[in-house]
Amino acid sequence: VKGVLNFMVTRAKIPVHTVNAAYMIRPGIGFIRLESFGMKTHEEFMEAVEKLKQQGMKRLILDLQDNGGGFLEAAVRIANEFLQDNDMIVYTEGRRVSRQNYKARGNGRLKDIPVYVLVNELSASAAEIVSGAIMDNDRGTLIGRRTFGKGLVQRPFELPDGSMIRLTVAHYYIPSGRCIQKP
């Protein structure tokens, strides 16, 4: 092709859904797969839970395999649904960043439903926070392989030229006190 080709590109919002599967495996057993932890994950997750409860869900398989993580707040909100009041979900701590605890508020709607969490070597960050909170609070059973080990809290810092750099300021720790970050 000779010459210049001009194109008009129209930007559109593309909805990104983080719950990419939710169904009954057999009577009484629901299955939900979370692909990542985004801004609407909790809302999507609870919609899926309510539909499965209406179909008679008594147990839940939560699939976090290949889930690379996402927003801390989304992970905390999901974990809260399974835990009792004041149960530790995760805490962060760094050399120059004081410890910050994230605890369950006791208003979770899945506190009495047995849960089985599927994880693998690509389950990272927020997925490790949820699975770690469920495991350390004896709230469910983890099934699978050792997770990725991404437990860094990173903050963006703007540089004078307008660019940004993300620096590690703290680490994530599951309730047992174990750091998620792989050495």
Question: What residues fall within each predicted segment?
Answer:
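Cleft-lining beta-strand/loop regions that shape enzyme active-site pockets
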Residues: 1-160
